[in-house]
């Protein structure tokens, strides 16, 4: 049985990880061996455990200890701290109503190299400076559903392990392999060295159609999506082998990046991956 610790005061220091440390502070770039993230809801926590993430502690509504949290707790060491409180205490925690009554602090896993993530991959997504955790989560959910083998991110973008990103992804940030691209070098060249051809999603008049036979014939394809608002950098588009855009109607000029990713993944990965 887990080690249950009753919490009656929102100011209790045991709640600092969950209530007072920012997600950037939890990342702890100065001491990556002790970096943490917080997963929320039994579904997301369960998928993190499936991926081998190590739990540090739990915070949960007391009634869930023997309820919907019991199965998750049964998978964890018997001495793991489980901070339990009644709902009036926990509702002081911003966004607690979205957690399904359960939070878990976990060790951040070691990220693999780009070569490791891309080994045996045929269709990958590259996310350049995408800042919104909701978009990151939605893209990962689409990637898992639509046959994308891996996701690569630039370091300036949002963290897939942020609570909102993991929640929106339905835990699929723990299913789809991912890592960050190295800073200070040309990642299109790196992907070319790994055998990938790159396709930029961008609003250019000379863009190809998504079902262009040249794209469908590529054995290894990296689909490159850009930041909200501005899209991909001009230098990135120039470095890619192809540029495509999604046909629009009714005068609409573009889709949200998460919606655009789903359309591209469906055409280029699920149907032709």
Regions found by a protein language model. Give the residues of each.
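A glycine-rich helix N-cap at a beta->alpha junction
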Residues: 75-95, 179
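Anion (oxyanion) recognition and catalysis
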Residues: 49, 76, 192
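Boundary-proximal intrinsically disordered activation/regulatory segments immediately upstream
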Residues: 1-71, 157-158
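Structured adenosyl-cofactor binding patch, chiefly the S-adenosyl-L-methionine
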Residues: 102-104, 142-146, 157-173, 234-273
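Short, aromatic/basic amphipathic alpha-helical patches
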Residues: 67-79, 236
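Active-site/ligand-binding-proximal alpha/beta "capping" segment
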Residues: 199-252
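RNA substrate-binding interface of SAM-dependent RNA methyltransferases
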Residues: 5, 109-206
């Amino acid at each position: 049985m887990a080690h249950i610790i009753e919490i009656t005061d929102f100011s209790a220091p045991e709640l600092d990880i969950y209530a007072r440390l920012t997600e950037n502070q939890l990342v702890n770039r100065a001491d990556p061996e002790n970096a943490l993230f917080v997963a929320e809801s039994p579904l997301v926590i369960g998928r993190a455990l499936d991926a081998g993430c190590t739990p540090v502690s739990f915070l949960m509504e007391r009634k869930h200890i023997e309820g919907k949290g019991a199965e998750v707790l049964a998978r964890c060491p018997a001495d793991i701290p489980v901070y339990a409180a009644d709902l009036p205490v926990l509702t002081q925690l911003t966004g607690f109503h979205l957690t399904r009554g359960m939070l878990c602090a976990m060790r951040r896993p070691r990220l693999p190299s780009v070569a490791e993530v891309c080994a045996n991959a045929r269709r990958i997504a590259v996310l350049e400076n995408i800042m919104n955790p909701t978009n990151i989560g939605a893209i990962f959910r689409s990637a898992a559903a639509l046959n994308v083998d891996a996701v690569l991110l630039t370091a300036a973008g949002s963290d897939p392990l942020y609570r909102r990103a993991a929640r929106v992804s339905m835990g699929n940030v723990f299913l789809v392999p991912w890592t960050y691209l190295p800073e200070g070098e040309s990642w299109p060249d790196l992907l070319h060295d790994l055998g990938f051809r790159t396709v930029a999603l961008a609003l250019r008049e000379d863009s190809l159609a998504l079902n262009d036979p040249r794209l469908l014939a590529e054995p290894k394809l990296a689909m490159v999506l850009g930041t909200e608002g501005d899209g991909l950098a001009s230098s990135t588009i120039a470095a890619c082998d192809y540029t495509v855009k999604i046909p629009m109607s009714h005068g609409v000029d573009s889709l949200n990046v998460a919606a655009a990713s789903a359309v591209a993944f469906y055409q280029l990965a699920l149907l032709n991956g």
